[in-house]
Regions:
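Conserved phosphate/anionic-ligand binding catalytic regions in large, soluble enzymes, centered on
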Residues: 11-27, 303
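Flanking helices and flexible, charged tails adjoining ferredoxin-like Fe-S electron-transfer domains
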Residues: 16, 44, 293, 297-298, ...
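Gly-rich Lys/Arg/Thr-decorated short loops/hinges at beta-loop-alpha junctions or inter-strand turns
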Residues: 36-48, 170
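Histidine-anchored nucleotide/phosphate-binding helix
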Residues: 53-70
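Flexible, glycine/charged-enriched surface loops at secondary-structure junctions
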Residues: 72-77, 100-101, 195-203, 262, ...
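Hydrophobic alpha-helical positions that pack around
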Residues: 76, 81-184, 190-195, 204-205
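Active-site gating/interface segments in enzymes
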Residues: 109-112, 118-125, 198-253
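Ferredoxin-type iron-sulfur electron-transfer modules in oxidoreductases and energy-metabolism complexes
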Residues: 227-249, 259, 264-343
Length: 402
């Protein structure tokens, strides 16, 4: 069975973000760079960092397999230079194996892990507006995805477990492996985490979403962060969307900070969040409104840039939904893109972001405790944990599974 079919059969999807099926990225021509994304730019999450430090052999072997299968000219593991243990472990593994894979050490800025930002950093090329990395000859997989690729190919293992970080307002932050489908509330109770009358974020403080304790862990869950209600990391997420849209119409002072610091604007894309905010009283046909489709939803605008604490991110998400209903798709007349000159000095240092969001008191290592010690009495498996059509179950009600 070829690599693509193995990954499809074993259910390997992007372990972070939208869960793009990994097999669908594997073209056998036109790939110059195969990039492993180890930046893990969301504060308080340690999954990728811990996997690289503890399992460098799996990461390196999986990347080598995918490089060989696709015929990629170059394979790169991109991670922040400050991840000293991960850098040391990967360097040692590459020295031992002699594989033609390079490490690319990135600065400590947000969002270093955005795949289009990473492609520019590694290759010097800008992914076109509305495009994906393959448009400039690059493929990007995150570190846990590579861990699962190794399991699928070398161990015949399907993706039935997920690494997650438990952090925020907890006594002992931890990174661990749990069965997919584990109920969040059961897991937090098992770990002795107090989450009553608090907010649970699925993901990081920037791009994560508020979830209910009855929700299950999925293949794309990167972490569970616990915060007190009203904390700066969750206040905008808790706000009603109608209130956010109203404030966008009446409270935006057009300072343009959201635009000047927007990662996609700095890539050279035609995205100006400040003009979208200014256009909120107009129709969907307004040309600035359509720019919302270029937003990567990193949250830098709402968490760091806006002095009014408005949320261009959530405004853009709401606009995207309306444009999708209208069947609108973004098209660009430009063929070549270059990053804006100001990009080099407008990168936002992650430490400043942590201070702005009042995360410093929670910024403690969440070391990996390996082992299959989390054994829930039952799991709830959503059929749609990825981009594309829902999965089709191979078992029926009443079947015994192991």
């Amino acid at each position: 069975m070829e690599v693509r079919e193995i990954l499809r059969e074993k259910g390997v999807v992007g372990a972070g973000g939208a869960g793009f099926p990994t097999y669908a990225k594997l073209k056998e021509e036109g790939i110059d760079y195969y990039i492993a994304n180890g930046a893990e730019c969301e504060p308080l999450l340690d999954v990728s960092k811990e996997i690289m430090a503890r399992f460098p052999d799996r990461v390196v072997k999986a990347l080598s397999i995918l490089k060989d299968f696709t015929g990629a000219k170059s394979a790169v593991i991109a991670l922040k230079g400050k991840y000293k243990q991960a850098v040391k472990a990967l360097d040692a593994e590459l020295l031992k194996t002699g594989l033609d894979i390079k490490l690319f050490e990135m600065g400590d800025f947000f969002p270093a892990g955005d795949e289009q930002v990473m492609v520019l950093e590694v290759t010097g090329k800008v992914v076109p507006e509305g495009g994906i990395p393959i448009a400039v000859g690059a493929v990007v997989n995150n570190i846990e995805t590579l861990y699962n690729v190794y399991g699928a190919i070398e161990e015949d293992s399907p993706v039935i477990q997920k690494f997650i970080t438990i952090g925020g307002q907890v006594k002992n932050p931890i990174t661990l492996k749990v069965p997919v489908g584990t109920t969040i509330g059961w897991l937090l109770d098992f770990l002795g985490v107090d989450y009553k009358d608090k907010v649970i974020i699925d993901g990081g403080p920037m791009m994560g979403n508020i979830v209910d304790s009855n929700s299950p862990i999925t293949k794309t869950t990167g972490g569970l962060l616990i915060f007190p209600k009203g904390h700066p990391a969750v206040s905008v997420k808790e706000s009603d969307i109608n209130r956010i849209l109203k404030l966008a119409r009446i409270a935006c002072i057009q300072c343009r900070y959201c635009t000047l610091q927007c990662p996609r604007y700095l890539l050279g894309h035609d995205l100006e969040p400040s003009k979208i905010m200014l256009s909120m009283g107009f129709k969907l046909s307004d040309r600035y409104i359509k720019q919302a489709l270029l937003c990567c939803e990193c949250g830098l605008c709402e968490a760091y840039s806006c002095p009014q604490r408005l949320s261009p991110r959530r405004v853009n998400i709401a606009i995207k939904k309306e444009l999708a209903k209208a069947g609108f798709k973004y098209t660009t007349g430009k063929a070549d893109f270059s990053p804006r000159e100001a990009r080099q000095w407008r990168k936002i240092f992650t430490g400043r972001l942590k201070i702005r969001l009042q995360l410093m008191e929670f910024d403690r290592p969440a070391l990996l405790v390996d082992g299959d010690f989390v054994k829930p009495p039952e799991v709830h498996i959503p059929m749609k944990q990825h981009i594309g059509a829902p999965a089709i179950p191979l078992v029926s009600s009443g079947d015994k599974v192991t």
